[in-house]
């Protein structure tokens, strides 16, 4: 399933949403420019659970937790996150206002990062991605727009359908898939 758009029009220009998408794309372009030194860069600048636990929550760790939200592990990771932010973030920003949306986005990203750190405190793998912040935006979307529908590209074997799916169903499936991929 690939979301194409929702049926909720925005009343304001979603500048923060667009800036977040542009920032994620710019950071990914920077990642690509690093070539072979990318791994070392990520290990130096991303949050690593065991380091956060051993060093405590310092200003340096706060910076790493912020950077973590803008690093991505590949094209699919980046593009899927940005597609969901593009489709659902504009409405959430419209309802919350620009500044509150930015604060909400960052806070849910930090909460997701902390949840991962506390779930896997001995992990030495750097955390990358905006998925936690995106999940926060999707949760807010469901609360704010429970009756919304999502125009969706659905693949059924060799057939492709474009249909409207209730946002509750669409995002429920997304959530289950996230859980399954996280436990695989």
Task: Describe the predicted segments one by one.
Residues 1-184:
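A detector for small-residue-rich transmembrane helices and their helix-helix packing motifs
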């Amino acid at each position: 399933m690939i979301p194409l758009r929702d049926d909720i029009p925005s009343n304001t220009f979603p500048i923060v949403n667009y800036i977040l998408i542009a920032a994620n794309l710019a950071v990914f372009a920077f990642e690509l420019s690093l070539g072979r030194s990318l791994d070392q860069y990520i290990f130096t600048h991303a949050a690593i659970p065991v380091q956060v636990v051993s060093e405590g929550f310092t200003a340096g760790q706060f910076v790493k937790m912020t950077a973590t939200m803008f690093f991505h592990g590949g094209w699919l990771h980046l593009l899927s996150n940005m597609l969901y932010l593009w489709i659902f973030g504009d409405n959430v920003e419209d309802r919350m206002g620009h500044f509150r949306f930015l604060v909400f986005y960052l806070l849910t990203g930090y909460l997701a990062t902390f949840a991962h750190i506390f779930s896997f405190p001995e992990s030495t793998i750097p955390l990358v991605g905006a998925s936690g912040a995106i999940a926060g935006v999707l949760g807010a979307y469901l609360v704010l727009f429970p009756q919304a529908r999502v125009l969706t590209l659905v693949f059924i074997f060799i057939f492709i359908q474009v249909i409207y799916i209730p946002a509750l169903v669409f995002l429920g499936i997304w959530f289950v898939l996230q859980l399954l991929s996280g436990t695989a």
